[in-house]
Amino acid sequence: MAAPAAPSIARRLLLWASMILILLAILEGASAVFLKSVLPKTARFLLWNPDIAAAHKAWAKVAGNWDDELGWPSPREAVMPPRDATGAKLNPDFPQPGQACASAYGDSFIWGDDIPLKDGWIEQLSRKLGCRVANYGVSGYGTDQAYVRFTRNTQDEAPVVLLGIFPENVIRNVNQFRAFIGFAQSPVWLKGRFVLDGAGKLQWINRPRLDEAGFIHLLRDPASVVPHDYLLPDTRDGPVSLRFPYTLTLARLALMPRLRVRFTGSPTWSDFFRANHPSGALALTAAIAEAFVREAERRGKRALVVMLPDAGSFRVRAELGRPEYAPLLAALAAKHVNVFDPAPALIAALGARSFGARSYCTLYAKPASCNGHFGIAGGGIVADVVMVELRRRGLIK
């Protein structure tokens, strides 16, 4: 009986090609599912996938209700509850504006997200001091917006002013459209920004004046509308555009420097504190903070920059012996800017309370997952530590 004929070379090649195509199709399908369904829920800042229909609805919803330079809050919302007529957060213990012993500017770590309005650490500090501390924090702000808000707020009569810097601000300061870092695609989240000119001086880049068509154009061709935004899609540190082939998109994501940094256990913004980072974020943030302090001095105030570490900052400190924002502390000290890093005192305070391993997690509103903003109990500890520092420096009697 004759042996069966061996498959021809052509048939073998066709078989292998079919298997490879099937594997590629499976890989492409899995990549598409991951990029479209999983990643947007866990790390939306990594992807750029504008929804034009949703953008039209977002435009109609806000109807021009924004600040022409800072983006948010709008002039109307800036003096509406939960803010008072001066733009400060309502303080039930000291509800009457005026005669504040101190004021504070910054982002949600100053405002006090994740907890009741009366329980933010600024409000707890106010109760401990027995005087009004006017809270001008705004969620989502960068150091740049906090500074501009302070320059505008000429009715701030407090003799002492705090500038809170959450480490992620270093990224926000080189960004104009918050949608590039995971915020909703709304015109509200569009802002101006500072750059440093050739002499190292701050120069303000205006917020683009857009109509609805211009806003849609921003989503479709961001570089033509906000060319000074460091985090433009498909740049070194910007989000990756979601497009076919999805496997290639996934590969580009894997090569993102911010993602590689995150895999080391450090916060995604850590690299931005390097002096040689292409964003120039360190020098810019230091210049903005210095400008804030000099403006305070010009107005007869005393200013203190306060770092507001998140849980990731404590992890980096434990592993490396210093936080990721250490270069900013050094840069501000070199500029003779008074800056306070409460982390060592917070660690000591937590140790004295015998919270045990990973005690820094108890500072935050979500201690089980070790994230969020300062919680009620943690905010009380932050307020204690800052109060001691204010008194040590003679800023508060």
Provide a role label for each language-model segment.
Residues 1-101, 156-159, 170-226:
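N-terminal secretory targeting modules
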Residues 35-128, 132, 147, 237-271, ...:
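Membrane/wall-proximal cationic-aromatic binding patches
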Residues 107, 146, 161, 296, ...:
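Generic structural signal for small/hydrophobic residues in well-ordered secondary structure
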Residues 132-143:
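A conserved hydrophobic secondary-structure block that centers on an alpha-helix together
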Residues 143, 147, 282, 286, ...:
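Short, amphipathic alpha-helical "lid/cap" segments that border enzyme active or binding sites
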Residues 148-157:
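Short, well-structured alpha-helical segments in soluble
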Residues 167-330, 334-337, 342-353, 364:
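Serine-dependent acyl-ester chemistry module
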